[in-house]
Amino acid sequence: MEYQYPLDYDWSNEEMITVVKFYEAIERANEKGIVKEELMDLYRKFKQIVPSKAEEKKIDKEFQEVSGYSIYRTIQKGKDTEEHKIVKM
């Protein structure tokens, strides 16, 4: 899909790459499916960059507006999925 990911230009290039990989994982979970461990590992890395719940909610809202996918619902599904299984929305 072609849309602009929500990014904070105060993030370093490495942090932006990490966040974009996380967004791509959310897309995969919603489109094809992704192994739980991969999704949750990328979420942990995302949370190191965005530790604030308020900022995470803001980013989720912006991401959902451009992609149609909810970070929150996808991560909740990931948490509820058994180990080594595919997370698919």
UniProtKB/Swiss-Prot annotation:
Disulfide bridges in this chain: none
Lineage top rank: taxon: Bacteria
Gene3D superfamilies linked to this entry: BH2638-like
InterPro entries: BH2638-like_sf (IPR023324), UPF0223 (IPR007920)
Family: Belongs to the UPF0223 family.
Name by which UniProt lists this protein: UPF0223 protein Bcer98_2663
Origin species: Bacillus cytotoxicus (strain DSM 22905 / CIP 110041 / 391-98 / NVH 391-98)
